[in-house]
């Protein structure tokens, strides 16, 4: 069992005070990082569940609910995990190979494994450096990070901290010029693709947040909009506009970067996205945070892969917690998978090194699952590897 530190209210309060101070004081931040590493060095963090257990003791309860929660009854949130249990693996035997290669490309960019970092808002809730620490950890793992519009570190700061490739996830706003300006900034900062989130015509009803009256702490902000704080009578300034298929046409006039659409759960929408010239589709239900009772991401993957038929790359996020989960998604046609909540857990436990370790755990588990199933290259993984029960 993972050692339980900081479980008392006083301990959690002191931990939060240290983290807030580290956010404001660069000199104290170095001390904070060193002490965090010492606290975790003797813990046996073997899997992502271990990280989840420890992270909960280090994140303020309302923030934890924001990170972990889903919409309404959280049916889809739970289904994202349980759906993987209905898929079993069909291992092959006596395969003669001694090396296992996990390297691949995503939209032509080399990465060390088909496991990426999903866009997620407000990462300073878990660590003073937030998204910058995540970018550092992803770079250590030689994989790609997707940075959120709602980051608590600016997209430029994230790019400066990153040693690996970046994509930028975009929400569109009522003020389209603001959206266009953010896209241009991402392009100038070296981001390699734009990920349009298309499943938020309005925010899902997240009851945990409502009960907690959750809001971003006063010492944090939407770092990509430092000079655009709306006046009280401009409440719609930052509200997402309802995207339509014409939105993709507009976005293509703003940037020459490849565009992916995130939030697709049906073959019909995948085909419409293809007609609009997208370079990739991310099969996702927003981590179970939007429409409750929607399909689990892994349940939607097959029909989208079949509809696309190789005409663009298909990715998946939602519920990935084990290397076997990633292997099942790859077998069903995903180019790569993305991790969301586990990145927060790694951040809370040990900053960029925690993120790196979370990704390395997933790498080791995926490699183990591939070898035990008789596959030593991503190229040999196909649908014959899985069976629904």
For every predicted segment, state its role:
Residues 111-155:
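Glycine-rich active-site/cofactor-binding loop and its immediate structural neighborhood
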Residues 67, 145-147, 167-170, 259-261, ...:
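Short catalytic-loop micro-motif centered on adjacent basic/acidic residues
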Residues 71-72, 149-153, 174, 265, ...:
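Short beta->alpha linker loops
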Residues 1-43:
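N-terminal flexible/basic segments that precede or flank functional cores
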């Amino acid at each position: 069992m993972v050692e339980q530190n900081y479980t008392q209210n006083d301990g959690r309060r002191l931990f939060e005070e240290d983290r807030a101070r580290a956010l404001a004081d660069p000199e104290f931040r170095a001390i904070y990082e060193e002490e965090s590493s010492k606290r975790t060095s003797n813990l046996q963090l073997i899997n992502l569940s271990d990280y989840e257990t420890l992270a909960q003791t280090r994140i303020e309860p309302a923030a934890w609910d924001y990170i972990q929660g889903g919409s309404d009854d959280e049916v889809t949130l739970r289904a994202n995990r349980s759906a993987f249990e209905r898929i079993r693996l069909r291992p092959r035997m006596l395969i003669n190979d001694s090396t296992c290669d996990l390297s691949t490309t995503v939209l032509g960019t080399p990465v060390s494994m088909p496991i990426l970092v999903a866009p997620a808002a407000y990462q300073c809730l878990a660590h003073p450096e937030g998204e910058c620490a995540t970018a550092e950890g992803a770079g250590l793992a030689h994989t790609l990070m997707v940075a959120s519009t709602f980051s608590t570190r600016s997209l430029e700061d994230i790019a400066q901290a990153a040693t690996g490739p970046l994509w930028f996830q975009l929400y569109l706003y009522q003020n389209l010029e603001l959206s266009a300006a953010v896209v241009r900034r991402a392009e100038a900062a070296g981001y390699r693709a734009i990920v349009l989130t298309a499943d938020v015509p309005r925010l899902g009803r997240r009851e945990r947040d409502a009960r907690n009256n959750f809001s971003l702490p006063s010492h944090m902000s939407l770092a990509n909009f430092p000079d655009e704080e709306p006046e009280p009578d401009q409440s719609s300034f930052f509200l997402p506009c309802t995207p339509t298929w014409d939105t993709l046409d507009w976005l293509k006039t703003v940037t020459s970067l490849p565009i992916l659409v995130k939030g697709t759960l049906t073959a019909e929408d995948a085909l419409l996205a293809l007609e609009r010239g997208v370079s990739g589709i991310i099969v996702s239900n927003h981590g179970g945070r939007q429409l409750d009772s929607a399909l689990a991401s892994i349940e939607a993957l097959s029909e989208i892969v079949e509809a696309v038929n190789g005409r663009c790359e298909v990715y998946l996020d939602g519920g990935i917690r084990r290397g076997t989960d990633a292997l099942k998604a790859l077998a069903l046609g995903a180019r790569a998978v993305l991790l969301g909540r586990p990145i927060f857990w790694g951040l809370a436990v040990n900053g960029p090194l925690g993120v790196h370790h979370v990704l390395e755990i997933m790498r080791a588990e995926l490699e183990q699952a591939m070898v035990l199933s008789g596959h030593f290259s991503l190229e040999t993984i196909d649908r014959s590897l899985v069976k629904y029960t």
